[in-house]
A protein has these predicted regions:
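Conserved alpha-helical "signature site"
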Residues: 1-255
Length: 255
């Protein structure tokens, strides 16, 4: 169905607040829960005594996730000169605990969504862009007084709102995908307004994919900087809570 949510009266109400959007999304649509494996990884990362062996064992329960982590560890991006024969070696020798945990968390989390693989906004390009932003955020983090691992996670997960849009509203997502292909220089916000924001301000997605992602991350109880970086990364000139993480993601997006 169409995603416009109409309020009572003559259609002249002001645009929905973010709290109203969150409330309507949760009442009207079945928002995907965080997948069980992603939740287990998130809990492990919150444990300061967790070991590389525990992380490797958790990942190795999932053959597909294991293969993807091994592929990243062997990729030219990290340029490790030796052999990598196990997930534990990927953790201890190449990628480090935080990076493996965060990549695994991202990979496990995207399984919550059914989104096309292809197209400029498809899953393949989504991952390429997310990993690139995460890598840049990790480099930028020390210069911003931010924590590197958390910066990486902010970069990796900042665009999850796009996946939720694609999952809940496939027809509109296809239209947005085509618009993006035809207008690569346009801002995502302006393209989203063309697809979602044409009525009287009552369209729940007119707040943009960033805010939608922030709502999902808050529901999934991800760390506050991750929620904020996703939620406001489309707002230029943002000043407020976790500003350094937001600016980092915005800079990585622009590079």
């Amino acid at each position: 169905g169409h995603l416009v949510i109409r309020g009572p009266g003559n259609g002249n109400r002001e645009a929905l607040t973010l709290e109203e959007v969150a409330d309507k999304l949760q009442k009207l649509y079945r928002l995907p829960p965080m997948p069980a494996l992603a939740l287990r990884i998130l809990r492990l990362t919150a444990n300061t005594d967790a070991t590389a062996r525990e992380l490797a064992e958790l990942i190795e329960f999932d053959p597909s996730l294991t293969a993807q982590i091994m592929r990243y560890a062997r990729s030219a991006l990290f340029n490790y000169p030796g052999q990598v024969n196990s997930v534990q070696e990927a953790v201890t020798r190449v990628l480090g605990f935080d990076r493996v945990a965060h990549i695994a968390l991202g990979i496990a989390s995207v399984r919550a969504f059914e989104v096309p693989r292809h197209g400029i906004l498809g899953m393949d390009n989504f991952w390429r862009h997310s990993l690139y932003c995460a890598f840049l955020c990790q480099i930028i983090a020390p210069r911003c007084g931010a924590e590197k691992g958390l910066g990486y996670l902010c970069g990796l997960l900042h665009n999850f709102g796009l996946l939720l849009v694609g999952h809940l509203f496939p027809a509109e997502f296809d239209e947005l995908n085509e618009l993006r292909e035809a207008n690569p220089e346009a801002s995502m916000h302006s393209l989203e307004q063309q697809v979602f924001g044409q009525g009287n301000g009552q369209e729940i997605l007119s707040v943009g994919h960033g805010a939608i992602g922030g709502i999902l991350h808050r529901l999934w109880q991800l760390p506050d900087p991750v929620v904020k970086a996703a939620g406001v990364h489309q707002q230029s000139g943002y000043h407020g809570e976790h500003e350094n993480y937001v600016l980092m993601v915005q800079l990585a997006n622009a590079l």
